[in-house]
Amino acid sequence: MLLVIDVGNTNTVLGVYHDGKLEYHWRIETSRHKTEDEFGMILRSLFDHSGLMFEQIDGIIISSVVPPIMFALERMCTKYFHIEPQIVGPGMKTGLNIKYDNPKEVGADRIVNAVAAIHLYGNPLIVVDFGTATTYCYIDENKQYMGGAIAPGITISTEALYSRAAKLPRIEITRPDNIIGKNTVSAMQSGILFGYVGQVEGIVKRMKWQAKQEPKVIATGGLAPLIANESDCIDIVDPFLTLKGLELIYERNRVGSV
């Protein structure tokens, strides 16, 4: 079995693959201060609840956009699983030709998403990931990672509105009954949700115009279904795109793989 770990700024998503199929998945809060033993105990609890044993895991791969957490995670893997994990980064086989000015600047999550999207949905593609930041990645017809855009995530923007405007409350990010809000909460929900729908549609439209192509648009991340329900510009929502990409990259970099 393969353990895949995707460390984001807000949440860490973990999954277990067996024979190429995602059998289990969990989401925990990302903490920069946990030790390898604390991570080990969290994994022990998740595994016990799912009827799994550490000894069943024979491979681990990690992608992370939070460097301070990596030392503890790597120590956890070697101490509790007795496995040296693969770490997504420069030098790994991905099949991507990255056309960024400095390819090392491209986040591991964006690379992993691109690998999965190409494999599953073909190319050209735009991949939109609704995470702590909302990222847009353009992959052309030759599987070249051409670049993209990075915007503040929906949750960040919502929290900024609450924390910087004294009379505005903290709200749930959900669809309001009306676009024209009749109270403060519904007005904020309308502005946040439909403002982001407009952002997605605007950036996707401009990327297509610049590339002079009609790529598929793949969305992932916790709020992807909410946005996709309000916009025709998103073709496919894949909530496990990153975990699928990690499994693919692991297989391409196994000892003995071609």
Swiss-Prot record:
Q: How is its activity regulated?
A: Not regulated by feedback inhibition by CoA and its thioesters as described for many other pantothenate kinases. Not inhibited by N-pentylpantothenamide (N5-Pan), and this compound cannot act as a substrate either.
Active site: which residues? 109 (proton acceptor)
Task: Write out the transmembrane intervals.
Answer: none
For the protein in the UniProt heading, the enzyme class is transferase
Which UniProt keyword terms apply here? ATP-binding, Coenzyme A biosynthesis, Cytoplasm, Kinase, Metal-binding, Nucleotide-binding, Potassium, Transferase
Q: Which Pfam families match?
A: Pan_kinase (PF03309)
Q: Which residues bind ATP?
A: 6-13, 132
Catalyzed reactions: (R)-pantothenate + ATP = (R)-4'-phosphopantothenate + ADP + H(+)
GO terms, biological process? coenzyme A biosynthetic process
Give the quaternary structure: Homodimer.
Give the UniProt family note.
Belongs to the type III pantothenate kinase family.
Q: What is this protein called?
A: Type III pantothenate kinase
Query: Gene name, please?
Result: coaX
